[in-house]
C-alpha cells in the first residue's frame, strides 16, 4: 500500500509570533537581549597592569602586623607605594619627627589611600594650629595633576642659592626645629647698628627631570608669614613684611607683599604661616623677602603631564578616640575626574582601632579585579550595556546606560518555527517593532563598525543558502545609515544651542551629560530593536532553508524507496518499506528531530572614550548565528494514504 508522508510545521497556543525583517518566527520562549546590571560599591580598575596606588600603613606590606593591619589584599598591596606613618603631605613639608617617604611611581589610573597621618590628631604646629585648609588645597592639586600625568614623584632636594647673611632657623612651636619644606632662614642682627638687616634674595631651580622621572610641571608650596598689623612685624622699625616668588621673567608667581597688600587687621601679636599650592614649570625662580626671615621652597612634587587617567581617592580617617579631618573627601569631590570611596560606618579595625576595617576591605576588594566600567556609583564588570540607575560621574571605561527593563527588546528562544514575513525594506511590518522610527529621538553620537552590522549578520546569499539576499540587506542598511546621518545632524544643532548655557552655567554641563546619556540609551535600544528584527528574519530564512536541506537528506536516504512528489512530501510503499525502514528514512534512527537548536550568540560591545567629560559614543555591534549544524525541531511527520 502506498502512503503519503509529509513534513509539517506544527504551532499551537504556546507559541508566540516574532516579526522580523526578512522573515518571522514562532517561538515557545523569549528572552531579553540584555539584563540590567547593578554596580558594585567601592573601587576597581580598568586594567591591572596600568594602575598604581599611594598609601600608608593600611596598604603597607612591611608593617609587622600585615595583613591584619591592611585594608587591602596582598595582591593589591603589591601595587601600592606605601610606608607606615607616611602621607604625601608629610613628605611635602617634612615636619620634625614625622615619617618622610619618597613617594613616586607611574600608572594611568592612580589610587590614593593616605592622608590620615596629617590630621588634627597629629597636632602639628609650626606657626599654624590648623592645617586642614592647606591639606585640602594640597590634596586637590595632587589629584588634579595626577589625573593628567602617567608618572609623579616627590622631589626632595631642590637646587638653591641662599644669601650669605641667612642661616637655618628653628622655632619653639615646631619642636625647636622646623619644616624641611619650606626651610626657615633667619638673619642675626645687632641693634642699633644693624637693627633690620638686609633684604633676602635667594634662588631655587625646579628640574626637568628627577632621577628617571620627567618633570613638566611641579607642585610647589609658596609659604609666607601673615602678620595682623604692621606694628607686629615692624617692632624694630623695619618697614613692611614681604615674601615673594618671581619667575625668570620677573613675574610674581607666589607669596605675599604687605607693601601693597593690607594686613589682616586682627588683634593677634604672633604671626601664622600660610602655604599656597602653586603649579610651576621647570626653571630658575627667585625669592625676595624682607629682612630677618626667609621661607625657602626646598621640595616639590613633579608630574610628567603625559597621560590623562582616572583618579580614585579613598576616605582616610581614624577609628574612635582620634580626631580626623575630611580634607581628602572635599578635595576629591571638588576635582573633576576624581572618584571618592567613602565609608558608611565609623572606622573599626581588626588589628587595632585604626587598622583592618572590614567595610573598607569590602570597598577596596574590587582593586583585585578588572572592571569594564568604574564610576562614582561603583564598578561594573558585566557586559550588559544597561543598568537600572544612572551611574554618577566621573566614570571611565565602557559604562552601561540607564534603561527600564521593559524597554529592552526580546528575542525568540526555545523551540523555533519559521514562517514567511516582511522584507528588510518594509518599514512597517505586520507587528510593529521597536526599530528605526524610535531612533530619531534626542542626541546621539554613534558609529557603526566599518563592515556594518550586516557584515556580521547577513552577508550575501550563497548556493548553499543562509541569510537574506544581498540586495535586500544593502537597502536595509542604507536606510539605517541615512537615519544615523539625520541623528548626527540633529546632534550638532542641539549642541550648538547648548553652548551658551554651558559658558554661563556649570550646572548646565551636568544637565547636558545626563541628557546625552538618556539619548544614548534611547538610541541604543532603538539599534537593538533593529538587530532583533534582523536576527529574527535571518533565523527564519535560515530555518526554512534548513527544512529544504532536511528534505534533501530524506530523499537521499530513501533512495528508490520513496518518491518526492512535492517539496517536503514523499510517496512510499509500506509493503516494501516497513516501519523500521520508515524510521530510518524519516527519523534518522530516533536521532532527529532534536528538541533544541544551537543558542544565539548576540553581543553588543559598547565603546566610549576613556574620559567621561566630552566623550563620544561608538557603538560596535556584532551579532552572529550558527546555522551550519542546525537541525530543525518542531516538525511532525504527517502520513496519509
Curated annotation (Swiss-Prot):
Q: Where in the cell is it found?
A: Virion membrane; Host cell membrane
Q: Which residues lie on this side of the membrane: Extracellular?
A: 1-616
Where is the segment annotated Esterase domain-2? 297-351
Source organism's superkingdom?
A: Viruses
Q: Which InterPro entries match?
A: Capsid_hemagglutn (IPR008980), Hemagglutn-estrase_core (IPR007142), Hemagglutn-estrase_hemagglutn (IPR003860), Hemagglutn_stalk_influenz-C (IPR014831)
Q: Pfam families, per this entry?
A: Hema_esterase, Hema_HEFG, Hema_stalk
The record's principal subcellular location, in a coarse class, is virion
Q: Which GO terms describe its cellular component?
A: host cell plasma membrane; membrane; viral envelope; virion membrane
Q: How does it sit in the membrane?
A: Single-pass type I membrane protein
Instruction: Tell me which family the UniProt entry assigns to this protein.
Output: Belongs to the influenza type C/coronaviruses hemagglutinin-esterase family.
- Which named protein is this? Hemagglutinin-esterase-fusion glycoprotein
> Organism source for this protein?
Influenza C virus (strain C/Nara/1982)
Organism lineage reads as: Viruses, Riboviria, Orthornavirae, Negarnaviricota, Polyploviricotina
